[in-house]
């Protein structure tokens, strides 16, 4: 049986947040999360049961791939009945990718899965890591009066915003406020108090058990359009062996060149069973393929409309 004390499993995949300076060499090294309270003594003030799991060896987030997402899902699924929430410490470069993937892989999720990290190592003087870690743990443990989780979904917490995982993008390589959710408001804002937005938070079906998914098809490419893009580039990309899907980043509200060869290449690809999804290159806004003639040509070629900016 699980104790009444709120319980959080901390999963360290790698990244800047888990680094401390070696006093002898000055080099940054991964610290042992079994000694977490030594490095973040503030956690003692929480009346929580905090356990940790760390990837061995930790990975640079630039090396993140679907196999590691499956590993995270397995860890969460295995421990699902023993913890109230989960905090994943992750490098910032691909954190948004992982958060988005987990939001689909953890079907019927009814507990918080909060990803966070830092721009400065937790062992440096001005680190943002401690605040991010402490707040992420507090959010992961937070419950409503009826005992249900306040935020039962996959999120990213960074600086002072809690954001839906599959709506979040890294926007800055240096600032502490490195992530933003352009097309969906923050689920919580953090200052002196944590101010949740209950009307924006996903409501799970309590009758459905967690349904984990482990398999991803890697045969997907991104086609970013630009003025002057050549037919040879599009042709070679659409004929990659084994290709299953294309995420096509278009102009504005979903517009693309009207050249005959371009539309023909797209149509031939969709007729071969390749899925082509139209998303905008813009940071915010959405695709409206019926708004301009260029968008109508894409629809006729079998391109699928993305309802939101990914």
Model features per residue range: what roles?
Residues 88-111, 258-265:
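Short Gly/Thr/Asp-enriched flexible loops that form oxyanion-binding sites at enzyme active sites
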Residues 121-133, 283-297:
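Glycine-rich, charge-decorated loop segments at or immediately adjacent to ligand/cofactor-binding or catalytic sites
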Residues 308-310:
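Conserved small/polar residues in nucleotide/adenosyl-binding loops
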Residues 251-288:
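CN hydrolase (nitrilase-like) catalytic-core segments centered on the catalytic cysteine
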Residues 115-191:
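Internal gly/pro-rich beta-alpha loop/helix module
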Residues 99-130, 138-143, 270-280:
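Short, acidic/small-residue loops that bind anionic groups at enzyme active sites
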Residues 5, 11-15, 36-44, 164-248, ...:
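Accessory alpha-helical/coil subdomains and C-terminal extensions
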Residues 1-78:
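ATP/NTP phosphate-donor binding region
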């Amino acid at each position: 049986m699980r104790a009444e004390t709120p319980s959080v499993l901390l999963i360290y995949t790698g990244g800047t947040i888990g680094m401390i300076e070696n006093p002898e060499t000055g080099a940054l090294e991964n610290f042992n999360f079994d000694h977490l309270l030594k490095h973040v003594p503030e956690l003692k003030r929480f009346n929580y049961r905090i356990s940790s799991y760390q990837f061995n060896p930790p990975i640079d987030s630039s090396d993140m791939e679907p196999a590691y997402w499956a590993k995270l899902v397995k860890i969460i699924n295995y421990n699902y009945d023993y913890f109230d929430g989960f905090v994943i410490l992750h490098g910032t470069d691909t954190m948004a990718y992982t958060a988005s993937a987990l939001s689909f892989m953890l079907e019927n999720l009814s507990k918080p899965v909060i990803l966070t990290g830092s721009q400065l190592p937790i062992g440096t003087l001005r680190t943002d890591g401690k605040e991010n870690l402490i707040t992420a743990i507090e959010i992961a443990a937070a419950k409503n009066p009826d005992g249900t989780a306040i935020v039962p979904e996959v999120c990213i917490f960074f600086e002072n915003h809690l954001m839906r995982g599959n709506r979040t993008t890294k926007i800055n390589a240096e600032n502490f406020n490195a992530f933003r959710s352009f097309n969906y408001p923050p689920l919580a804002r953090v200052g002196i108090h944590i101010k949740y937005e209950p009307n924006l938070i996903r409501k799970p079906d309590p009758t459905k058990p967690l349904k984990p998914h482990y398999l991803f098809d890697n045969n997907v490419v991104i086609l970013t359009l630009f003025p002057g893009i050549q037919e040879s580039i599009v042709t070679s990309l659409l004929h990659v062996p084994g290709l299953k899907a294309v995420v096509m980043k278009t102009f504005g509200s979903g517009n693309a060149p009207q050249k005959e060869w371009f539309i023909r290449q797209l149509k031939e690809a969709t007729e071969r069973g390749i899925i082509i999804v139209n998303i905008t290159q813009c940071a915010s806004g959405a695709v409206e393929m019926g708004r301009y003639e260029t968008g109508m040509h894409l629809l006729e070629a079998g391109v699928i409309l993305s309802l939101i900016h990914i």
